[in-house]
Amino acid sequence: MSLQSIKYSRGSLEILDQLLLPGQSKYEVVRGVEDGWKVINKMQVRGAPAIAIVGCLSLAVEINPEDFETKKSLRQEVEGKLNYLVSARPTAVNMKIAADELITLANDLYKDEAIDVNGMKQRFLDATEAMLKKDIADNRAIGANGAKAILQRVAEKGGAPAGSTGSVRVLTHCNTGSLATAGYGTALGVVRQLAELGKLEHVYCTETRPYNQGARLTAYELVHEKFPATLVLDSMVAALLRAKNVAAVVVGADRVASNGDTANKIGTYQIAVVAKHHDVPFYVAAPLTSIDLAIPGGDHIIIEERPDREMTHVGEHRIAAPGINCWNPAFDVTPASLITGIITERGVFKPAELKEAITKLLES
């Protein structure tokens, strides 16, 4: 059974505090937007889909008990607080897309004279809660599409890697499972689907320095699921791909530009370079809400920079020399030329065909 990172019922929201994992499983109560902003910014909850879900649900929890005198006051509160939530972690596009969608809904409901203020609030709450259910369904579709693509690619290359039992070995980076989404996962959802099909021989996960999401979170999920899994250091990826017959790399995304350039957790770019050298397919698994057609390329993606302390300390223990300068970008951008395919809930697309394909899907 998948881990539950988000617990929600109308008027109540709790998130599994991921800063405490794997040592302690503790749920943090989110009472409203200010709490939502803090748990996102502090990375108590992380992963682009989960950020959007928790951000929107924190607003739902806040407005649920409120009585609004006018539709205008409700619309203003929705717009102002959603824009504030976007600022918590700006690189992940999912929160921005979800905010824009809900603001558009609020404006449409405001203009609809047949709906009163209570009806407007109810419709808004329903739409927010629907995002939670949709994310889980989308994750499952991503998993199915990704597993199919990887197995088909292996078959085209002449079968599973030498020495395997017909199943595949895959590498993933950072954390993209139930802890990063509403449930099931994106890239880890692909791994999960391979396991459900009986086609997962082994999964390797990187430690993902400096925040160690791979070691703390992905390894935690893999052990929980009892998948055959091995943790490797970020610096071992080249040796791993040379020695272990890895069939594919599959990672998540915080933002995908219209040309396929992909911003993901720092370290993703170098894995893609190494995968290209070793002729290992490199897949990005992401929902359509992670694709930003308004951005032509990766150079336009804002990269969040994190505090030096995340590099210089482990807990309260300093591991770097005092006085050393640090550069700590949370993400890097993998060029589309290094990406084999982008796995979405609506199919797997080559980066070159992404913009046209997604535009047609959105129009339909």
From Swiss-Prot:
* EC number(s) on file: 5.3.1.23
One Gene Ontology cellular component annotation? cytoplasm
Active site location: D254 (proton donor)
Pathway, per UniProt? Answer: Amino-acid biosynthesis; L-methionine biosynthesis via salvage pathway; L-methionine from S-methyl-5-thio-alpha-D-ribose 1-phosphate: step 1/6
Coiled-coil positions: none
Arranged from A to Z, the UniProt key words for this protein are: Amino-acid biosynthesis, Cytoplasm, Isomerase, Methionine biosynthesis, Nucleus
Q: What GO molecular-function term can you cite, just one?
A: S-methyl-5-thioribose-1-phosphate isomerase activity
One Gene Ontology biological process: L-methionine salvage from methylthioadenosine
Q: Which family does it belong to?
A: Belongs to the eIF-2B alpha/beta/delta subunits family. MtnA subfamily.
Q: What is this protein called?
A: Methylthioribose-1-phosphate isomerase
Tell me which species this is from.
Answer: Drosophila erecta
